[in-house]
Structure formats: C-alpha cells, structure tokens
Design a protein with these regions (language model features):
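Conserved small/polar residues in nucleotide/adenosyl-binding loops
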Residues: 124-130
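Conserved structural elements of the adenylate-forming
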Residues: 99-103
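Glycine-rich, Arg-bearing micro-motifs that act as flexible, cationic patches
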Residues: 96
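Active-site neighborhood of HAD-like aspartate-dependent phosphohydrolases
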Residues: 113
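Short beta-strand scaffold segments in enzyme catalytic cores
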Residues: 104-108, 118-119, 126
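N-terminal subdomain of lithium-sensitive/metallo-dependent phosphomonoesterases centered on the IMPase/IPPase/PAP
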Residues: 1-89
Length: 134
C-alpha cells in the first residue's frame, strides 16, 4: 500500500476526532439543540454546523490549496486536483431523535478519484481510516 497520503489521513482523522467531541457535547443536551428543516425529513442542527466548521478549519489550516465541498456550506472557489468532501454529521435525523447511529465522514479525492476516507462514530469512539489503493 502506498502511504503517500498518510499526512492527509492523519489530518482527516484528527479533524474528525475534534469534531466528534463537539458533536457529543451537543448530543448530551439534545433538549436545547437548535434544529432547522431543509426539507422533508432533512434537517440541519447547530451540531452539524459546528462540526463542519471545526473540520473545514482544520483542513484549511493544513491544506489551504485544496478544494473543500461540505454538506452544509457547499464548495469553496479553489481550483485544485485535491478535493475534500465532508459530511459533518451523517445521520442528523437519528442524532436529533437521540438514536446513537450517526457518524462524521471525510473523504479526499485526487483528480476526482477517492484516495482516502475517514468515518468516525463518536458515540462508540470508533474511527475507521482508509487509504484507497488504485
């Protein structure tokens, strides 16, 4: 396996863990969570927004020339061979109903081909990093 992308993987793992701590703080106080409907059975909470901000800040700090596409804020205007994809709280509906089946997902593509990904399940403290070998 080619470990060329290990620094990016470490950055994504660390960003997901930081965001996960924030998400779990919100999960511990769901009764006061601010939630907005984006459509039928499609919600965004302040936990989604805070998680996305934490992740995008971490990725921008380490890789300022990479494009970022995130679920809540869309894409930045950077033209790059590398593009991060972020779902800051995959399973928002479960999350807001207190169902502990949600995760943070971060992926990185090079020339539109996936090269690494991280799924972090904060509730169970499980983080699954992957480097794709093509």
């Amino acid at each position: 396996m080619n470990n060329t992308f290990s620094p990016q993987l470490n950055t994504a793992v660390n960003a997901s863990l930081l965001a996960g701590k924030s998400v779990m703080r919100f999960y511990s106080r769901l009764d006061s969570l601010k939630i907005t409907s984006k459509g039928f059975n499609d919600y965004v909470s302040e936990a989604d927004q805070e998680s996305e901000l934490i992740i995008t800040d971490a990725l921008k700090k380490s890789y300022p020339k990479y494009k970022i596409t995130a679920e809540e804020s869309g894409s930045n205007d950077i033209n790059s061979d590398y593009e991060w994809f972020i779902d800051p709280l995959d399973g928002t509906t479960n999350f807001i109903h207190g169902i502990p089946q949600f995760a943070i997902s971060i992926g990185l593509c090079k020339n539109k081909v996936p090269i690494l990904g991280v799924v972090s399940v904060s509730y169970t403290h499980l983080t699954l990093p992957t480097i794709y070998s093509v």
